[in-house]
Swiss-Prot record:
GO molecular function ontology, one term from the record: calcium ion binding
InterPro entries: EF-hand-dom_pair, EF_hand_dom, TPR-like_helical_dom_sf, TPR_rpt
Segments forming domain EF-hand: 6-41, 595-630
One Gene Ontology cellular component annotation held by this UniProt entry: plasma membrane
Organism: Arabidopsis thaliana
Lineage: Eukaryota, Viridiplantae, Streptophyta, Embryophyta, Tracheophyta
Protein name: Uncharacterized TPR repeat-containing protein At2g32450
Keyword Iron-sulfur: no
Length: 802
């Protein structure tokens, strides 16, 4: 563990090494030398150096001493604000502590010898935070508590190590992206790369907690409230350093009770709660820290960037990415050199589909910290999402060069190679992922798929078997079944190599005919599948449509006025995200993040076409109502009620015709963009229509298959069927087991899955037919009934003939 005062001493040694003229300041030339020296692997241009120095000298202007330049306190502050990593820079410079240096430092001010001796002893006993001028120990009695606690922790660790109860997660530190959050206020050392898991159910741990309670009682018995606060904060920090997070939280909570308006205990409690996976409670503590910092004037102003960053990260832990973006932006505005804030902002923007903005933020982070592997990884992912694949490959490779075992970079680069059809290279990337993370089942599955794409069927089969050992997910069994079907097909081809053709041909839509009224038309199914895919990604079907009605009834939204003076209940995107979190509270954070990304890209981008960042809440409710859970008729009713809830219609039982037309065209623009976007252009050009529409008239407009949103009847059919399996039936084109509806060609008997039918794919064997007649079966039971009816009719006909 880092010793007391060592962090400040490291900064001092760095400062002394580059203060060439010993004038107590770092000039631009000296700062330039420092930046270059601590980034030995980076080749800076003169423009980059100049920009970095301009930013530093502007941000820390209060620490600039005339021509001398940046003072020692200024350099220390840059590290405190997260603009650099002290330990990394110290190691990069190859500086070592030695007895001569320590002796010289002590001799430089030999007065008050006894106090210096006492301080030197203190510095040998615990961590750097304790001697920080802003966040360290204030009272002498607190030192005694800290020393006693260190003995207790050491004893507990020794006993648990001896009994083999102490677990240390010794994962490859290169494998994962950095958390990027500020663990401390002011000078600190980060938690060890090795996560420690204490055995809390052991007898030794119980004894430790009991003895810890005695120390807490001593802190409570201090002579003043300030001293008690100092004691509990120090106890909490020591426990936090040793990764005893639950016990540390108790101490920080007690400190919060003693001084509710102090930023530090709330911040520390938030950190503990985040590590313990209690993201909502963590967010609440950071909000209290933010409130205290903002009301405390300039006293805590320099801590605001750290609070904003950690608040953003705790929100991401809940899946609230849009809200997190707001706080990362605030941190970056307050501290423009905070490269972690910029990186986190870029990553969050990527997470909600704002790729161009993500690229800009990530490039700024890399500009400030060129060896930031995580920023390179997310920048490459953003570039790939924008279609700049070759540049993305270069940036992914740069991330891997900086961190050879970077799992995210290796895995995502493998996915990029798969998209480009470079299967052999993809397989190599997934192999490297598995070398770092052997039980990464997705990498193992993707390796099998890439090997299959590369034509190495036997290797693919072995890789799939390995994946099955890691997990028993149904998609793996489908993949194995698919592989077997392909092998069967391959054997048939070998016996008839002269007529070997591609796996399918695409037939024009007019050649696909339907048998029976219940069989879905091919174009309708293609659109419905897209809507259903969006519905599944967003999990809106898990939100009962009645929950939308309750939101409208129970939560008041203030009325605002748009540019043309029309009253509206508009809301900012982050606030809308909070509402969606309530509606989709059953989703895990990572699933909710995916839902927000899809909603932001598909719905909010259309509703907020002006880029104001605000959305008409009533229209939003009406747009998502058709995809929520519940009976289709109820969904339509709630959509109509959402339009009634808008200020222009409130209090009435009817909506304006123009509002109804706008709604229908918005639905088509969002969910059927190939047909609907051109119609939206007409909406903005229409004159005001004061006529009104009843609910029944609204239903007629809604259900119109050509100009309305009648496609929802097909979507509802998919909702009820898309988990149906058809026994051993496989699609004649893709060879995957058929799930959902089965489309059987009545003349030749081949069957297609939903996807292949919607895309017009047929086996090349049947390409000579003039037309193809399909009957749709919801299940094999339905198919068997149809077959029995057919046999019965044939038998009956024969009897009559006789």
């Amino acid at each position: 563990m880092t010793t007391r005062g060592s962090r400040s001493e490291k900064v001092k040694r760095i400062f002394q090494q580059f203060d060439g003229n010993l004038d107590g300041g770092l000039s631009r030339e000296e700062m330039s030398a420092l930046v270059v020296a601590v980034n030995p692997r980076v080749k800076f241009s003169d423009e980059q150096i100049s920009a970095i120095l301009d930013e530093v000298f502007r941000t820390y202007a209060e620490f600039i001493d005339g021509d001398k330049g940046l003072t020692f306190d200024g350099l220390l502050r840059t590290y405190d604000d997260g603009a650099g990593d002290v330990d990394r820079d110290f190691d990069a410079l190859g500086i070592e502590f030695n007895e001569e240096t320590k002796g010289a430092s002590e001799a430089s001010s030999s007065s008050i010898t006894d106090e210096r001796a006492v301080e030197a002893q203190k510095q040998q006993r615990t961590a750097a935070w304790a001697v920080s001028p802003n966040h360290g120990i204030v009272f002498d009695e607190t030192w005694k508590l800290v020393d006693d606690l260190e003995i207790l922790v050491k004893r507990l660790k020794s006993k648990q190590e001896k009994d083999g109860k102490l677990k240390v997660d010794n994962n490859n530190v290169d494998a994962f992206s950095e958390a990027g959050w500020s663990r401390e206020l002011g000078p600190s050392s980060d938690i060890s790369d090795k996560r420690i898991y204490w055995e809390e159910s052991s007898h030794d741990y119980g004894v430790f907690v009991k003895e810890l309670g005695v120390l807490r009682s001593k802190a409570d018995g201090a002579r003043s409230r300030e001293e008690a606060f100092d004691g509990h904060m120090a106890i909490g920090k020591v426990l936090y350093e040793h990764q005893l997070f639950k016990e540390a939280l108790v101490s920080f909570k007690r400190a919060c009770e003693l001084q509710p308006t102090d930023v530090r205990p709330h911040f520390k409690a938030g950190n503990c709660l985040y590590v313990l996976g209690k993201y909502k409670e963590s967010k609440d503590e950071f909000l209290l820290a933010l409130e205290a910092a903002e009301s405390g004037g300039n006293q805590w102003a320099y801590l605001l960037p750290q609070i904003y960053v950690n608040l953003g990260i705790s929100l991401e832990g809940e899946g609230m990415v849009l809200s997190a973006c707001e706080y990362y932006r605030e941190a970056a505005i307050l501290c423009p050199t905070h490269y972690r804030a910029l990186k986190l902002l870029g990553s969050a923007l990527f997470g909600v589909g704002e790729y161009r903005a993500a690229v800009k933020a990530l490039e700024e982070a890399i500009y400030l910290k060129p060896d930031y592997a995580d920023a390179h990884c997310d920048l490459a992912s953003s570039l790939h999402a924008m279609g700049e694949d070759e540049r993305a490959i270069e940036v992914f490779q740069r991330a891997i060069d900086l961190k050879p075992g970077h799992v995210d970079a290796l895995y995502n680069l493998g996915g990029l190679y798969m998209d480009l059809g470079r299967f052999q290279r993809a397989s190599e990337m997934y192999t490297r992922v598995l070398a770092v993370w052997p039980n990464h089942w997705r990498a193992q599955l993707n390796k099998a798929v890439s090997l299959l794409g590369a034509g190495e069927t036997e290797e693919a089969k072995r890789a799939l078997k390995e994946a099955l050992k890691m997990t028993n997910r149904v998609e793996l069994h489908d993949a194995v079944s698919h592989l077997k079907q392909l092998q069967k097909k391959k054997k048939v081809k070998k016996g008839n190599s002269a007529n070997e053709e591609g796996p399918f041909i695409v037939v024009e839509s007019s050649k696909f005919k339907t048998v029976g009224e219940k069989t879905t038309l091919r174009p309708d199914l293609a659109i419905a599948l897209q809507v259903r895919a969006f519905q599944r990604v967003t999990r809106l079907w898990k939100c009962d449509v009645e929950a939308l009605r309750r939101e409208m009834r129970d939560n008041n939204v203030p009325v605002s006025y748009s540019g043309n003076g029309i009253p509206t209940k508009s809301i900012r995107r982050p606030n809308l995200e909070e509402i969606l979190r309530r509606l989709l509270n059953v989703l895990k954070p990572e699933t909710f993040q995916g839902a927000i990304k899809a909603i932001n890209e598909k719905i909010l981008s259309v509703l907020d076409d002006s880029g104001s960042g605000r959305v008409d809440l009533g229209m939003f409710y009406a747009v998502i109502a058709p995809l929520c859970g519940g009976h289709p008729d109820k969904r339509k009713r709630v959509a109509f009620d959402a339009l009634l809830w808008k200020p222009v219609n409130e209090g009435s039982s009817q909506i304006t015709k123009m509002e109804a037309v706008k709604y229908i065209k918005l639905l088509r623009a969002i969910y059927i963009p190939s047909q609907g976007m051109s119609e939206m252009l007409e909406v903005h050009g229409e004159s005001d229509d004061t006529s009104t529409v009843t609910f029944n008239q609204f239903l007629e407009m809604y259900d119109d298959s050509e100009w309305g949103f009648g496609i929802m009847s097909t979507v509802f059919k998919l909702e009820t069927r898309d988990r149906n399996r058809h026994g051993n039936q496989v699609c004649s084109v893709c060879r995957y087991p058929i799930i959902g509806s089965r489309f059987k060609e009545v003349k030749t008997g081949f069957s297609l899955c939903n996807q292949c039918y919607s895309e017009g794919k047929i086996p090349p064997t049947f390409k000579q037919q003039e037309e193809y007649k399909f009957r749709e079966y919801a299940s094999e039971v339905e198919a068997m009934k149809a077959k029995c009816v057919c046999f019965s009719m044939q038998s009956h006909k024969k009897t009559i003939a006789t």
